[in-house]
A protein has these predicted regions:
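Short, contiguous alpha-helical
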Residues: 5-10, 58-103, 153-212
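Short, structured loop/turn "capping" segments at alpha-beta junctions
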Residues: 143-150, 189-192, 215
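Glycine/small-residue-rich hydrophobic helix-like segments
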Residues: 212-255
Length: 291
């Protein structure tokens, strides 16, 4: 006698083990979706900085060169760069200037944004971001498809990429990661929802899968990220993962953005590895994508 009903053990397993998604099959970000995510993230970022007290602004952040006020200054400057043509040209002309050893071209852009606002108060920075933020998003949404598809050399860590990889994805990812920086620095809660923040982390995982595909050859690694923004992903062409890496989703973001290194993650017990430890640690050492 046969039945189409699932075995009770299979049902229990499906409840205790959430479905694992192949990271390379995560849907790419569309231009329309990019606009929606950018507006949500700007609203959440502004909502958080508007709650900060006077004592919060000088707190150091995971971006070791910047305190909380300087992170806000960077964000105000980044959005200002797409709110007016003159600001865009002034900021991005920095890409062609000589860099210091170990410095990325984009660091020069970021430095200018912060330096321009060195004397601005937090209230002035919030007011500026409230004004230029929506304008910048609207500008990016109006960019013609032909322009968005052009590939440009942005230098490390972006390299040679489509313009819309920057305008649709990286700018919003940057704001998201700096919201996390500010929440950690000030002890504030990071507002998270699976549809927005979970999608943000899924797109990080998609980038990571593209980067590691050749590294893994015929193998695969399972990433199990806990929390509201988390999920279970298989990275690599292999069908059965040889190891699993479990982390809180926000700690994974810090790792993949360079704010947390693998040794710190292990020393602070922020990562749990099962299976092939050598392979898992190799992948940890290469878990980085542009932010």
């Amino acid at each position: 006698m046969t039945t189409n009903e699932p075995h009770i053990a299979d049902v229990a397993a499906s409840i205790s083990q959430p479905a694992m998604i192949e990271a390379e099959h995560i849907a790419p970000l569309t231009h329309i979706e990019a606009g929606i995510m950018a507006r949500v993230e700007l609203e959440r970022f502004l909502g958080r900085v508007k709650t900060l007290s006077a004592a919060d602004w000088d707190q150091p952040t995971d971006c070791t060169l910047w305190n909380v006020r300087q992170v806000l200054a960077h964000q105000a400057g980044a959005y200002a760069g797409f709110a007016s043509w003159s600001q865009f040209m002034r900021q991005w002309s920095q890409l062609f200037k000589k860099r210091q050893p170990g410095q990325f071209s984009v660091d020069l852009v970021n430095q200018l944004q912060v330096a321009d606002r060195a004397n601005a108060s937090p209230a002035e920075l919030i007011a500026e971001l409230s004004e230029v933020g929506p304008k910048a998003i609207a500008t990016r949404q109006r960019l013609p498809a032909a322009l968005r598809a052009l590939r440009f050399p942005f230098g490390p860590p972006l390299g040679f990429v489509r313009f819309d990889y920057l305008t649709d994805l990286i700018y919003t990812r940057d704001t998201w990661s700096h919201r996390l920086d500010i929440c950690r620095a000030t002890g504030r809660e990071m507002v998270l929802t699976s549809d927005h923040d979970g999608r943000m982390l899924a797109l990080v995982m998609r980038d990571l899968a593209g980067k590691l595909h050749l590294e893994l050859k015929d193998s695969a690694i399972a990433f199990k990220l806990t929390g509201t923004a988390g999920g279970n992903w298989r990275v690599g062409p292999g069908e059965n993962p040889v190891a699993s890496i479990q982390m809180d989703a926000l700690d994974f973001s810090r790792l993949s953005s360079g704010r947390l290194n693998p040794d710190e993650a292990r020393d602070q017990s922020l990562v749990v590895i099962n299976g092939d430890a050598q392979m898992a640690n190799y992948i940890l050492a290469n878990t980085s994508v542009p932010y």
